[in-house]
Amino acid sequence: VLLGTNQYPNFNELSEGKEPAEKASCCGGEKKDSCDRPVKTLDNARMASEFEALRLSTEKSGKRPKAFMLTIGNLAMRQARAQFSCNFLACAGYEVIDNLGFQSVEEGVEEALKAKADIVVLCSSDDEYAEYAVPALKALDNRAIFIVAGAPACMDDLKAAGIENFIHVRCNVLDTLKEYNEKLGIKE
């Protein structure tokens, strides 16, 4: 966990022209001691550098994708999943739009489309995904990337119905975000 990078990122922070940190001096290279023997140098790679580069590539694209949380159903689960999803997607520099909750999938999709969302994340409980996920996918009709927050027991059924995107604690955050950037036409 990299606090402020892949956990609790600042949703509104911009790089303001900063570039990814490059390896400098001899760190990571080869150095010799006074007797001309090779000395192993320290690697100065920063753990956050790949996340920073991803966020910068999103910024440089000139497009700041909007990720809309379609929160519905069980209050505790939808809030927890929305918080997780906001943190997950903000790592790539996406604008995240959280919501208190919707009475129906149709209402949530309508609001997502009004907001011009590029990504819509369904946030609910595992038990409710069987009821809400497929109608949400159909209502979106490919007008945004559709994601289910979590790894519900009905995941195989949802995949069979055409739902491809799931984010959860076992996902590789960096690889998943790179995949979404690619789908959004954002180059590395």
Regions found by a protein language model. Give the residues of each.
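Non-catalytic terminal/interface segments that mediate subunit docking, oligomerization
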Residues: V1-S124
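Residue-level marker for well-ordered alpha-helical positions
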Residues: Q83, E106, V134, P152-D156
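Short low-complexity, flexible loop/linker segments enriched in glycine and/or proline
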Residues: V109-A117, A136-L137, Y180-L184
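Peripheral docking tails and interdomain loops at the edges
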Residues: K138-E188
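Active-site-proximal beta-strand/loop segments in catalytic clefts of secreted hydrolases
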Residues: S124-S125, A151
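Active-site-adjacent beta->alpha loops and helix N-cap segments on the catalytic face
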Residues: V105, E128-L137, T176
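Flexible loop/turn segments at secondary-structure boundaries
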Residues: N74-Q79, E128-E131, C154-D156
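Long, low-complexity, intrinsically disordered polar/charged segments
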Residues: T58-T71, V134-F146, N181
